[in-house]
Amino acid sequence: MKIGVLGVQGDVREHVEALHKLGVETLIVKLPEQLDMVDGLILPGGESTTMIRILKEMDMDEKLVERINEGLPVFATCAGVILLAKRIENYSQEKLGVLDITVERNAYGRQVESFETFVEIPAVGKDPFRAIFIRAPKIVETGKNVEILATYDYDPVLVKEGNILACTFHPELTDDLRLHRYFLEMVK
């Protein structure tokens, strides 16, 4: 199994390190043709407007949508969730539009208002998961086929729809590998 990490911007290294700890072969994906070389793909946190601009400049956006629609398992964190969302509230931004959610960008505040908390994620075990929110988006609406796996303050923070897992916080910034392991199970 080979897992790609989209290498255009953001927390690329942290996701690669998490996957290496789990003994998984990785590929930092920087070219459209590399999307055919991976069994699953992580879209890291970063800055969503920069990420979509780079994807378009590299002609990777359409290929990425094609691969996701073909069933490529994808794990998006923070800005990656914004890229996948069908709708963005109160902000005009290009997106891939493959996940049936509405998001609000930077909903928890600016960088200085970033925070950590613990969330319950029954799908990965009974122990609380340390969630780090950095300029995180908020999922304000989910489609009927979107499964909510975790919430914070009654808002979804971890959702799944088919082959897509989307997390508004940064699991790659913790030592807890349970969400990466959960994603690998989706890929198998």
Curated annotation (Swiss-Prot):
Residues forming the catalytic site: 78 (nucleophile), 170 (charge relay system), 172 (charge relay system)
One GO term (biological process): pyridoxine metabolic process
Swiss-Prot/TrEMBL keywords: Glutamine amidotransferase, Hydrolase, Lyase, Pyridoxal phosphate
Residues spanning the signal sequence: none
InterPro entries: Class_I_gatase-like (IPR029062), PdxT/SNO (IPR002161), PdxT/SNO_CS (IPR021196)
Sequence positions that bind L-glutamine: 46-48, 105, 134-135
Known EC number: 4.3.3.6, 3.5.1.2
Catalytic reaction(s) noted: aldehydo-D-ribose 5-phosphate + D-glyceraldehyde 3-phosphate + L-glutamine = pyridoxal 5'-phosphate + L-glutamate + phosphate + 3 H2O + H(+); L-glutamine + H2O = L-glutamate + NH4(+)
Annotated coiled-coil segments of the chain: none
Family indicated by similarity: Belongs to the glutaminase PdxT/SNO family.
Subunit structure of this chain's protein: In the presence of PdxS, forms a dodecamer of heterodimers. Only shows activity in the heterodimer.
Name used for this protein in its record: Pyridoxal 5'-phosphate synthase subunit PdxT
The organism of origin for this protein: Thermotoga petrophila (strain ATCC BAA-488 / DSM 13995 / JCM 10881 / RKU-1)
